[in-house]
Amino acid sequence: MHWQEGGGRGCVYTHGNCRRNLTARALQALQHVEALTCHYCVSLLHLLPLLLMWMPPVCADDSAVTVNVLSMMYNPEYYVEKVNAINAGFDASLSAHGWKTGSGATISVIRPPSYNTTAEDIFQLGVKQSEGKLLVVFGPLGTDPVVWVRDKLKENDLVAIAPIAYSSEVRGWNPHLYSISVEPNAELLALIRYAVVYLGLPRVGLMYAKGNGFDKESYEFTMRIMEIMGRKPCGVFAVESSGGRDVLEGQLNTKWGQFVATRPQAVLLFSSLEEETTGWFVKKIAQDNRTVDMYLLAPSSFQHFLIKTWSDALVSLNRTFTPGQLITTGTVPLASDNRSSMVRHFQRDMDNYLDTNSDWKGFAKPEHYLKDDKLGEMMVFGWLAGEVLFEALNNAPQLTNRTSFMESLYKQRRYVIDDFVVGDFGGECDEALHYRVPCVIAIKAAAWTHMRVVDDSLSLKPMKKGSVTWSVSECSSANVQVSAPLIGLYVVLTDDKVAQRASMRWSLGARSIEEADDVDKRIFFHSLKVNLKNLTQSLEQVRDTKAVAAVLGVTADILSVPNMTFIGPIPLFPRLNKFWRNVIHLQPLLAHELYVLAVYLSNTSSTGVKALVRGGEASEVVDTLDKSLVTFGVSLDSSKTLGDGDPMSSYLSGNGDVFCIGLTPPDVAAVARHLQTHLRARVFVPFNDILLFYQEFVAGFNASKESIASSEGLLFATSFPHWGKKNRKSDMVARFHRHVNESHWDPLTFLGFATTRLLQVVISNMRKVNAEPLADRIYTESNIRVDDVGFGPFSDAECVSGTSVSANECASNFGATNISVWSMGACAEFKLAQDTGWDDTVYGLCYSARGSTHTVTDSWNNFWVCIRLVIIYCPWCVPTHLPAERRNNNRAPKEPTDPVTLIFTDIESSTALWAAHPDLMPDAVAAHHRMVRSLIGRYKCYEVKTVGDSFMIASKSPFAAVQLAQELQLCFLHHDWGTNALDDSYREFEEQRAEGECEYTPPTAHMDPEVYSRLWNGLRVRVGIHTGLCDIIRHDEVTKGYDYYGRTPNMAARTESVANGGQVLMTHAAYMSLSAEDRKQIDVTALGDVALRGVSDPVKMYQLNTVPSRNFAALRLDREYFFDEGEDGTTTSTSDHSSSRADVSESGQIIATALQSLLSTFKTAHREKLLLPYCERWRVPLPRKAASEWDDAYCEEVVRRIAVKVGRVADHGADSGSESSSTQGSSSIIIVPFYDMHLQEY
């Protein structure tokens, strides 16, 4: 029994007609309380409310009162059986209560003489027979009767309980309509979500009648929801409403052909039942071989019609029925759903009523509602309406006043009926508008739409998945927020036990944080069960039939399948990484693990190293291991490539170090025995083998104290925090422990969990989620923070090395960081054996050649001893990443007669930020460059050049350029910069400017922090866009790219120069080059004529409003414009980072002299190797000169450019005294390890 406010069958609490009497026992208790000391009196008096709670209620006597219920639950246009079923259920409920309220009042039902009685006649009859009495209306049934009765209810101060209308038109706030079921749009929402996310269908069609108001309303709602979910219907079968007229067969067939050509996999059916074309359409689906297997989804009002029409069509065509093809919704549980205690309660009441009552002859047998589930559902609805009415009457303050009764209904009351909760009527859905809508709360106190499927017996069966819920605060589907879903596919290999188990454990972690089955759930997992032989073929088939955004978990040999995005793949055998943009690795690459383990070995004593490797790439793996060991002064004594059936146990011997790569289940036991036999031996395994065989390793080393001790000899490298350590200071681990049972705490389950958390973070701001946009977002975000674990940087850029472009040297599709060496024993003891100190945030790996007289590490260490002297002269030296270029020349505008749209960008106050935050700016600028380049690729634009922190971008399409600029600002706004220091500095710069300029008002310095966070975040970038003809478009033989000359690039650069940080300006020429349709899709503010320096006539300018509500200071017309023709005559931006023409300051001269003195002792090849990292980290462009090697003159120019850039930042810091705000504090020496700057995996 659920005791709630107003709860309890047949009794109420003191706020109603009932009151509590003090029993003799209660009176004795109170007398005893009076005899106690004051201290105990006070204490026990606090318990008085609790004592009262347990006193038996005694209800007021209302035996002389009669409450009339007017039954308008009928409609001559509906099946008689359906009408009878609802009324029979209603009567069964009230009969179970003896037709009495809890206070003894009689409940009397006024029924229509026949179902042909007009609504007006029955209503007048009910009002006439209820003068001076409380009258409640049951129904009406149907949209038209509900619309008709609304005004009549208001005139007579009446309430209609459980009206049924199939239009949202009557579901707005009306205190006279007391609905107990969800609205029609909620059912549509459930059907849309089921088709899109649970069936995962990329092609869903619609069918409706144009002239019908309800159909139009449903169509518009469906289109809105699908758009929000990032989808569009593949086709729409829409015909004019027949209105009783014959529809020409030829017209229907023409529309049918157009509809079928879109290859729909499912159709949402919400055309009106009276439309002849609805039946024609359903039969046509069954007749056409192209659509006979298509899913049909329809709301609850279509259940009878859909099942009958479909089954008749199949019988006429001699086709068999396919279970699961027809899908409908419901507003109450099915009468046969015995999982619900409310349904079991209904069955008891219904059985008793039908056994003892002959009013409903059609339902003489109690099991009738179980055989006909469609009518059984109607009975459940009627019974539930009776229970709600009974509870409402029990909670009314009096049973004679209609106004008082109506007001009592809307006091946020819930009615508990077994496990079904109805209530919270009258809640505010929108406080700002005071818009009140009755809200239905179902199981677990949330609005609920049930999903049903038709089985082979043409019976409705409840679905375990797909039902839609939303919280009590959402009273209407109009207020429910839905988002674009992500459908993830994981493979279950049925013919490989290791892979099958791995998939199950991975999915256990991935699914553990799936949200409850509510409306804002975004991530949905589908499994593909297949054998290894058919894996690739099956995946290609799924690609066409499912809207899969990512393939996850165990992937075997399918990474080369095109047009799929793979996230966190788990190979069954070791593989070296090849950069495929659509493959995103979350764990360390094998080459990185071997590199880190080589570092570990170089710091420990070793008696010899050998390798046992199994897999298709065994020879390549051995070569990579050998290079890693040689790099750190360790030699690989021997290696053995094993076949699939070769046991490793035959080759394990002695106390040396052995790399065992590509394990099978027998190998795990062999490794454990080897370490237990040879206590000084060490075995190194890839982390992927730990993932696959973790349970076997734990079992193999957990047999005795000796075996546990030997587990210290099993070593591997990982980037994970410890998944099993309790009270660990890791937010992700703590979250993992909250969602996953302790018995499942293992690395593979944790990887699945971490993958889902990563996806939740990545898609949080995505409006459309499929394979390509998902990969785009990951590369755009680059560094992704998930709880306390970082992934990245991910980069799909190319790098410039010297004067040539080298593909994939800077590209990075892996996100593991902080790789450390663990032992199995340390893992079991919940501690790290040893941390190598390696922070893997690199693009690749740098190896020494075999036979070299010294290692790479030695070279860098020696160089750093010298370079510390240089850094002493420059307290502002901080590295950043190499400028990358996207030289896809197919995207470059080449025709001189075609207009070119040019974009110039620059970071606002970049020099001041470098001076204030030398430790933050390298990563911030690197993130800036990655986001810009990712968008350049996404919108098929062309990167002309970078100068310092500035970009020059060309586009054939003006609209693509505008879209790029708009999304650029949004990317910066939503990016996790990892600090508020940049924002603090920008506000500080505004304050400083306001002190010097009286007319200047800081736009953001005094902004409320919450408002600021919605409008501003991190780096502020100004953007200028101009469209026009270029005087010259030249292909540069050195860079192999295209450059643009003349007034157009000059105008674009000048436009950018007057903008404020975060502002996008476009000239009138750029704006007018957009089509009328393009201009409708953007929001601009006309700024009028703007006088630009060096331009004779004012230029009409527009501001692209990328972030609504952002305000800017006046345009910076006073900003000095630097027109740099450079060495080749091309135009650059007004960036303050160009060093090609600038003079060397005093600080720069000191830096240049020191560098030249130090480098003079190195050969030319070493000078290039030592200087390149500075150019990369400080974003200094190399001289554009074709040379086979760096000669003395070339090196001197590179040093000069570095000195200009570093000297400028040093001078700015000295002039502004920015050390007070610098994130580096007062330190004058900054040393950053250089070994991870230009590393490459071979």
Curated annotation (Swiss-Prot):
<dbReference type="InterPro" id="IPR001054">
    <property type="entry name" value="A/G_cyclase"/>
</dbReference>
<dbReference type="InterPro" id="IPR028082">
    <property type="entry name" value="Peripla_BP_I"/>
</dbReference>
<dbReference type="GO" id="GO:0005524">
    <property type="term" value="F:ATP binding"/>
</dbReference>
<feature type="glycosylation site" description="N-linked (GlcNAc...) asparagine">
    <location>
        <position position="702"/>
    </location>
</feature>
<feature type="binding site">
    <location>
        <position position="906"/>
    </location>
    <ligand>
        <name>Mg(2+)</name>
    </ligand>
</feature>
<feature type="glycosylation site" description="N-linked (GlcNAc...) asparagine">
    <location>
        <position position="563"/>
    </location>
</feature>
<comment type="similarity">
    <text>Belongs to the adenylyl cyclase class-3 family.</text>
</comment>
<dbReference type="Pfam" id="PF25493">
    <property type="entry name" value="Peripla_BP_A-cyclase"/>
</dbReference>
<feature type="glycosylation site" description="N-linked (GlcNAc...) asparagine">
    <location>
        <position position="534"/>
    </location>
</feature>
<feature type="glycosylation site" description="N-linked (GlcNAc...) asparagine">
    <location>
        <position position="401"/>
    </location>
</feature>
<feature type="glycosylation site" description="N-linked (GlcNAc...) asparagine">
    <location>
        <position position="318"/>
    </location>
</feature>
<feature type="topological domain" description="Extracellular">
    <location>
        <begin position="61"/>
        <end position="862"/>
    </location>
</feature>
<comment type="function">
    <text>Could act as a receptor for an unknown ligand.</text>
</comment>
<dbReference type="GO" id="GO:0004016">
    <property type="term" value="F:adenylate cyclase activity"/>
</dbReference>
<dbReference type="Pfam" id="PF25495">
    <property type="entry name" value="Peripla_BP_A-cyclase_1"/>
</dbReference>
<feature type="domain" description="Guanylate cyclase">
    <location>
        <begin position="901"/>
        <end position="1056"/>
    </location>
</feature>
<feature type="transmembrane region" description="Helical">
    <location>
        <begin position="863"/>
        <end position="883"/>
    </location>
</feature>
<keyword id="KW-0812">Transmembrane</keyword>
<keyword id="KW-1133">Transmembrane helix</keyword>
<keyword id="KW-0460">Magnesium</keyword>
<dbReference type="GO" id="GO:0035556">
    <property type="term" value="P:intracellular signal transduction"/>
</dbReference>
<dbReference type="Pfam" id="PF00211">
    <property type="entry name" value="Guanylate_cyc"/>
</dbReference>
<keyword id="KW-0472">Membrane</keyword>
<keyword id="KW-0456">Lyase</keyword>
<protein>
    <recommendedName>
        <fullName>Receptor-type adenylate cyclase GRESAG 4.1</fullName>
        <ecNumber>4.6.1.1</ecNumber>
    </recommendedName>
</protein>
<dbReference type="GO" id="GO:0046872">
    <property type="term" value="F:metal ion binding"/>
</dbReference>
<keyword id="KW-0675">Receptor</keyword>
<keyword id="KW-0067">ATP-binding</keyword>
<dbReference type="GO" id="GO:0016020">
    <property type="term" value="C:membrane"/>
</dbReference>
<feature type="glycosylation site" description="N-linked (GlcNAc...) asparagine">
    <location>
        <position position="603"/>
    </location>
</feature>
<feature type="topological domain" description="Cytoplasmic">
    <location>
        <begin position="884"/>
        <end position="1242"/>
    </location>
</feature>
<feature type="binding site">
    <location>
        <position position="949"/>
    </location>
    <ligand>
        <name>Mg(2+)</name>
    </ligand>
</feature>
<feature type="glycosylation site" description="N-linked (GlcNAc...) asparagine">
    <location>
        <position position="338"/>
    </location>
</feature>
<keyword id="KW-0325">Glycoprotein</keyword>
<dbReference type="GO" id="GO:0006171">
    <property type="term" value="P:cAMP biosynthetic process"/>
</dbReference>
<feature type="glycosylation site" description="N-linked (GlcNAc...) asparagine">
    <location>
        <position position="289"/>
    </location>
</feature>
<keyword id="KW-0547">Nucleotide-binding</keyword>
<feature type="glycosylation site" description="N-linked (GlcNAc...) asparagine">
    <location>
        <position position="818"/>
    </location>
</feature>
<feature type="glycosylation site" description="N-linked (GlcNAc...) asparagine">
    <location>
        <position position="741"/>
    </location>
</feature>
<keyword id="KW-0115">cAMP biosynthesis</keyword>
<feature type="topological domain" description="Cytoplasmic">
    <location>
        <begin position="1"/>
        <end position="39"/>
    </location>
</feature>
<feature type="glycosylation site" description="N-linked (GlcNAc...) asparagine">
    <location>
        <position position="116"/>
    </location>
</feature>
